[in-house]
Amino acid sequence: MYAINYKTLIVQALGFEPTADQQHAIDTFAEFLADRDDHVAMLLRGSAGTGKTTLSGAIVRTMLALKQRVVLLAPTGRAAKVFALNSGVPASTIHRRIYRQQSLGGSFSLAPNMMTDTLFLVDESSMIANEGLRESVFGTGCLLDDLVQFVYSGRNCRLVLIGDKAQLPPVGEEESPALSSAFISGYGLTVYESDLREVLRQSQQSGILYNATVIRQMIAHDEATALPKIRFSGFPDIVCVPGDELIETLATSYSQVGMDETMVVTRSNKRANIYNQGIRNQVLWREEELTSGDWLMVVKNSYYWTEQKKAEDTSAPAFIANGDRAVIQRVRNRRDLYGFHFVDLWLQFPDYDNYELQVTALTDTLATEAPALTREQSQQLFDEVMADYADVRTKPERYKRLKADPFYNALQIKYAYAVTCHKAQGGQWAHVYVDQGYMTDEMLTPDYIHWLYTAFTRATEKLFLVNWPKTQTEE
């Protein structure tokens, strides 16, 4: 098919006259598809309000109408769910698509790409890390390397990376490598790229997108010498919430849009903990440490519990990922062992079609400031459980017993009413509350600007800025 036909069909699928930036992206995409060389990739970068999501959906619908195979991927379960909703096609996480388990309790190797003539579209690509993760059980530990290797090992398969450079880069990295044409061309690929900068007219009436655009321009021009001033007047979708009104306002959000569509975003685990305790005690009136209906976030990858279920349910996911959210259905059998606290939970995972799983969880991580068990705590748990198998003669057999021990493999969890921005990234909620904590001009860093932009753009309907200072408010 000629490139011109692709262009016409994508514009038709879009349903309105594209902006100049969108038209350029459509032209570039058509050239990318028409290139006869297999070693080509495309980067579609765009910030909030520029129509990147709408254009991605139109591209997917056009490809399907032409009977072209497409695979939709995203870095997290929540991001995959959002991508699927926006495009009308199922999406999965990158990890679940490109890795397969080598052995029970073992590592995951790169799966063979059995697809042919397939377009792989990856949303929220700013989150894809490529720093080798120590002790990673996935492939090489470099996710971007593995993704590229996987896609191009399939016959006539191509990759489109979609994302927003203004968002926070992966932890430990200066920029998002998956959105860098220099980085992607380093794989021996010819890179087609397009940037959406023009904010759509309907987006200009949104306070969330107006202010996000102002913040993004500070990033683009690298000119942040003072904290950004936020415009509230004339925008019903962005409001300032004084601390003494927070409990009542949060309760209203829960009743209006539900817990699944409400999120508090903070700058640290410490602040998130304070919010989680306060929300449970003063908004939800929960006294028990855990109760049915509680929202949790998994804070460390876990393979053990899904393995147990795979014996009876082959459709069970290969693992539960760090950042996955779950709702408690039942709580049973609290017990103290090895100097830690454990409980049996029946969980439902809303981002995975309400998949249900029974686990033993570790409650010590619920209120700690560390992201998960500390190195010292992990070592203590290892030593204590290992001592239970002291009578087992050989070291390999002791390790085998340890790997099969439910307490050693207990799920590490935190409450999920308030999270850090890195944990919220990739997700969107109708109502988002942002607490930046105490800030001064002297504390201003590029990282803070990326943080603020990412936090603002998690909200789809209403943004609540908690205790927002007058010095950061546009008069």
Name each model-derived stretch:
Residues 27, 31, 36, 40-224:
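ASCE P-loop NTPase helicase motor core
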Residues 337-475:
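C-terminal accessory regions
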Residues 22, 76, 268, 426:
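Short, conserved phosphate/pyrophosphate- and ester-handling motifs at nucleotide-, phospho-/glycolipid
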Residues 18, 72, 264:
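Conserved SAM-binding loop
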Residues 88, 279-283, 449-453:
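Short, solvent-exposed amphipathic alpha-helical segments in soluble enzyme
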Residues 39, 323, 416:
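Short coil/loop residues immediately preceding or within conserved phosphate-binding loops
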Residues 2-40:
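Conserved pre-motif I regulatory segment
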Residues 6, 25-29, 37, 152-157, ...:
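Conserved helicase motor core of P-loop NTPases
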